[in-house]
Amino acid sequence: MTYKITSLAGDGIGPEIMTSGLQVLEAVAKKYNHTFEIESHPFGGAGIDVAQDPIPSSTLKACRDADAILLGAIGGPKWDNAPKRPEDGLLALRKALGLFANIRPIQVPSSITHLSPLKKEIVENTDFVVVRELTGGLYFGEPKYWDNEAAVDSLTYTRAEIERIIEKAFEIAATRNKKVTSVDKANVLASSKLWRKIADEVASRHPDITLEHLYVDAAAMLMIQRPTTFDVIVTENLFGDILSDEASVITGSLGMLPSASHAENGPSLYEPIHGSAPDIANQNIANPMSMISSVSMMLRQSFSLFEEADAIDAATARTMQAGFLTADLGGNTSTTDFTNEVLKQIEGGE
């Protein structure tokens, strides 16, 4: 079968790690007899450089026409004073494709507990997913303005927006340990009161899945104290932005974690959670694991190629266990050497 993928390498270390991800995809295609048609397009700062737009029209069309989208990283000080910033392109892409659900898996296998800033006994075997609503809340609410005397942001959520993200969380929980933690601030916010009510309604349709409610401050605390108690966390845009970044540092490095953004219909977007790291760009020292894991996530969630995704995950695990660690993990393995070992493991793996 042929799968059509749009590649958005972006800025900073994005092109380097995208090269790694596409090499892994090529190895999978060869081993399992698949065809992946890859179209590469400028995005973010690269889009500004070639078209004065972080998401050129040709890039957006390619994304709409794809079966899935891979994104490297965007941004950098070069575009700080540009009329349009690279990050504007990502917001526009999310809106254009209707990407409403961001999925961020957080895993700390026993082999990497020493990298975590938390004690081994706290983080060992941590395995949960943060499901963040992407299209509503304070980031998109109107009216929105500020001047020297006052500023206004608007927090608005509709029933439909809340219900679909909570249903997505329950859908994911059904494939895991059947527990959903809904995070809100229902003791203060009107939107959270509606959020909690709808969460209860959705839970009533899934009697085999446990629902618990936590205020966002309590959730932030428990994520550090007892991260292994979570299975699937679902929350609104602002809370999800903060909590997912907090969760990410539990592993010890942002360089290992992928994420996915899903629409109700159409292509999904897969990307590392880290930034463009312009300070280490073009030095062959960036950790490509999060990009490689994003490829695995794409194969699993967009194409249902579970065996192929498992092969990538096993290959990256064996690579790390063999001592191939990049600088962010305390080693000195280069981007290309890490990637080459993963390719070797895929080709020679079971």
UniProtKB/Swiss-Prot annotation:
Cofactor mode of binding and number, as noted: Binds 1 Mg(2+) or Mn(2+) ion per subunit.
Reaction catalysed by this enzyme: (2R,3S)-3-isopropylmalate + NAD(+) = 4-methyl-2-oxopentanoate + CO2 + NADH
Keyword Repressor included in the entry's annotation: no
A biological process from GO: L-leucine biosynthetic process
Domain of life per record: Bacteria
Cofactor(s) required for function per UniProt: Mg(2+); Mn(2+)
Residues at the site labelled Important for catalysis: 139, 185
Binding of substrate, residues: 94, 104, 132, 217
One Pfam family this sequence matches: Iso_dh
Places the protein is found: Cytoplasm
Alphabetic keyword roster: Amino-acid biosynthesis, Branched-chain amino acid biosynthesis, Cytoplasm, Leucine biosynthesis, Magnesium, Manganese, Metal-binding, NAD, Oxidoreductase
GO MF annotation, one: 3-isopropylmalate dehydrogenase activity
UniProt keyword Amino-acid biosynthesis present: yes
GO CC term, one of those recorded: cytosol
Positions contributing to Mg(2+) binding: 217, 241, 245
Functional pathway: Amino-acid biosynthesis; L-leucine biosynthesis; L-leucine from 3-methyl-2-oxobutanoate: step 3/4
Family listed: Belongs to the isocitrate and isopropylmalate dehydrogenases family. LeuB type 1 subfamily.
Classification via HAMAP family: LeuB_type1 (MF_01033)
Subunit structure: Homodimer.
PANTHER family: 3-ISOPROPYLMALATE DEHYDROGENASE (PTHR42979:SF1)
Functional description taken from the UniProt entry: Catalyzes the oxidation of 3-carboxy-2-hydroxy-4-methylpentanoate (3-isopropylmalate) to 3-carboxy-4-methyl-2-oxopentanoate. The product decarboxylates to 4-methyl-2 oxopentanoate.
Name of the featured protein: 3-isopropylmalate dehydrogenase
Species the sequence originates in: Listeria monocytogenes serotype 4b (strain F2365)
Record gene name: leuB
